[in-house]
Swiss-Prot record:
Lineage top rank: taxon: Eukaryota
Topology with respect to the bilayer: Single-pass membrane protein
Enzyme class: translocase
Record gene name: UQCRFS1
Modification after translation, per record: Proteolytic processing is necessary for the correct insertion of UQCRFS1 in the complex III dimer. Several fragments are generated during UQCRFS1 insertion, most probably due to the endogenous matrix-processing peptidase (MPP) activity of the 2 core protein subunits UQCRC1/QCR1 and UQCRC2/QCR2, which are homologous to the 2 mitochondrial-processing peptidase (MPP) subunits beta-MPP and alpha-MPP respectively. The action of the protease is also necessary for the clearance of the UQCRFS1 fragments.
EC number: 7.1.1.8
An individual GO BP term: mitochondrial electron transport, ubiquinol to cytochrome c
Principal location: mitochondrion
Protein name: Cytochrome b-c1 complex subunit Rieske, mitochondrial
TM annotation in the entry: 105-138
Species of provenance: Gallus gallus (Chicken)
Amino acid sequence: MLSVAARSGPFAPYLSAAAHAVPGPLKALAPAALRAEKVVLDLKRPLLCRESMSGRSARRDLVAGISLNAPASVRYVHNDVTVPDFSAYRREDVMDATTSSQTSSEDRKGFSYLVTATACVATAYAAKNVVTQFISSLSASADVLALSKIEIKLSDIPEGKNVAFKWRGKPLFVRHRTQAEINQEAEVDVSKLRDPQHDLDRVKKPEWVILVGVCTHLGCVPIANSGDFGGYYCPCHGSHYDASGRIRKGPAPYNLEVPTYQFVGDDLVVVG
């Protein structure tokens, strides 16, 4: 009971412990001798504990009072609190608390804008290099590009003949035109063509015509020196091309493709 009263917290001052001896129904054969012992209190008990502080807690509402002969209040001041100093993060222009920061506002903004713009330009340049290297890694290597070109000796192709080569997995037509074919294709009215294009815009030398031998309709291979116009004829669906590779009749929508080529001397051409 004593321990319960001591541990009851703020209710300890209002509780008291009592012990009563209740005699039993049987009488004792001999009177028992009772010896009273003194209860020794532990005076060395620490002050700041639950049992010791329970008697010092406020039992009523807190009321502030003032007197002429007594101190007005009790202050609890914490002298260990320090105000943080941000001087290491502030600029020299705004270190003085008595000076307005508006006088140096434009200079500080200009410096911030300059640093931001420089960082953006550097980031864009680095991103451009990364993207360029990534795209270049996807492109064909030097050995593949070397195989993508073909050299053709023009002296092996007689006049009026067409020779087919294999270039990048496609047929390549090289035609040595006669003067009559050159004059005939030059006189064609461009306005009447489905895909208007002048003959001189499709050749670098009038006597040589270099074309990709794939029909622009469904990708068939035309037959050279045949058709209604003496150029190329696709037997799959009846597309007729002239000696310049221009569509003249049939379902094909465009002219035959002219690849990239250049003449290396008078007797050699490099396609690709």
